[in-house]
């Protein structure tokens, strides 16, 4: 039993932590690689999750339910990078959305273990897109990085526009992403939401897994508590005491909202942990096999723009040596996110109705 639990835990939790930079560095320049065709979002096969059909985004932990078809809100979710192996096709920098093996990985990992965290808050929409290869985060060729990410974002923007026009119909919505998905979600906020009529329908944006400075989304505040709406949250999870290299050029600390308490220290630059929350307040993590919830396993505190947690208490977790818990940004706090997203949707309805 312990062996099975350990294998299941490591197989998911370490998904994005064991990437070898040299192995995954794409030797092909962007200009030498063809670009896969853009997806048509009027075709349902170009969506990982779509209400009205059965897909991985419908799954729920034991004892919980997804929102009904009459749910008052929608969720637009953007998955993280799964295109990380050495490409087996001619498309080296962006995924071909017709790739069945990669699509299956997306469905069985981030859609099942991340997107479902939001299905109590509303109806989940998640597009397939020409995600940029993991190499974009390693390559020294910044022009290649930009071109690959621009292609990925163009798909996300097209999917969002289609979602708004054909599905959302003016309803409140939650925006969520992780890692590369968070990059694209932040661009959506800047280019499609902030300063438009859509901003009035935004319940909240969940943007974990990437460093985002507080002033980078001008016109949209950071959520400062568990009930705030029309705002955004972000965090990046590391083992207690680990200090990642500062990724922001001006030396500022990125936003870190504690996903257990949903408190925000306001970016105060102090060499002490802010807003520490004991693991007894942790609502639960989701690991393989999907369905079981592990409660009271994580504590959390904010330090200089990152979320510190002591090594989570799971079967076999004593073997974890990595200090980067990026792969667990959402599923480590699965029930905390699930409860909070639904709570903000409820609060949004109260505020709008007042």
Describe the residue ranges of each PLM region.
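Active-site catalytic motif of lipid deacylating hydrolases and related acyltransferases
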Residues: 24, 30-32, 79-171, 313-354
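Loop/turn elements at helix/coil->beta-strand transitions in domains of secreted/extracellular proteins
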Residues: 71-73, 120-124, 169-172, 199-203
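Bacterial N-terminal signal peptides
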Residues: 5-17
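Gly/Ala-rich beta-loop-alpha elbow adjacent to hydrolase catalytic centers
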Residues: 177-181, 185
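Basic, amphipathic N-terminal segments that precede the first structured/catalytic domain
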Residues: 21-66, 104
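Short, hydrophobic alpha-helix immediately C-terminal to the catalytic nucleophile
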Residues: 186-190
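Surface cap/lid and interfacial helix-loop subdomains adjacent to catalytic sites
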Residues: 152-169, 191-318, 322-334, 338-343, ...
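Short beta-strand element of the alpha/beta-hydrolase
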Residues: 72-80
């Amino acid at each position: 039993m312990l062996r099975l639990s350990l294998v299941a835990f490591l197989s998911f939790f370490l998904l994005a932590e064991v990437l070898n930079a040299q192995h995954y560095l794409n030797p092909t320049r962007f200009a030498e690689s063809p670009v896969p065709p853009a997806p048509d979002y009027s075709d349902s096969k170009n969506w990982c999750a779509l209400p009205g059909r059965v897909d991985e985004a419908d799954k729920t932990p034991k004892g919980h339910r997804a929102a009904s078809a009459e749910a008052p809100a929608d969720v637009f979710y953007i998955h993280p990078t799964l295109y990380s192996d050495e490409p087996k096709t001619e498309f080296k920098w962006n995924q071909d959305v017709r790739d069945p093996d990669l699509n299956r990985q997306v469905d069985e990992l981030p859609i099942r273990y991340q997107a479902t965290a939001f299905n109590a808050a509303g109806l989940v929409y998640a597009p397939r897109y020409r995600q940029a290869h993991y190499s974009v985060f390693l390559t020294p060729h910044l022009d290649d990085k930009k071109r690959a990410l621009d292609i990925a974002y163009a798909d996300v923007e097209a999917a969002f526009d289609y979602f708004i026009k054909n599905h959302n119909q003016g309803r409140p919505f939650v925006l969520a992403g992780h890692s590369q998905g968070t990059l694209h979600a932040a661009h959506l906020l800047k280019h499609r939401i902030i300063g438009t009529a859509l901003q009035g329908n935004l319940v909240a944006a969940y943007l974990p897994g990437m460093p985002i400075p507080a002033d980078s989304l001008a016109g949209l505040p950071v959520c400062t508590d568990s009930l705030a709406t029309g705002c955004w949250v972000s965090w990046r999870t590391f083992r207690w005491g680990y200090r990642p290299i500062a990724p922001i050029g001006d030396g500022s600390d990125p936003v870190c909202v504690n996903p257990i308490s949903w408190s925000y220290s306001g970016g105060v630059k102090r060499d002490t942990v802010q807003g520490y929350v004991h693991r007894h307040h942790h609502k639960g993590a989701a690991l393989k096999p999907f369905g079981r919830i592990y409660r009271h396993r994580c504590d959390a505190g904010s330090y200089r723009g990152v979320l510190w947690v002591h090594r989570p208490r799971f079967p076999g977790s004593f073997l974890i040596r990595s200090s980067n818990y990026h792969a667990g940004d959402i599923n480590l706090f699965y029930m905390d996110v699930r409860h909070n997203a639904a709570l903000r949707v409820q609060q949004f309805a109260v505020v709008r109705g007042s």
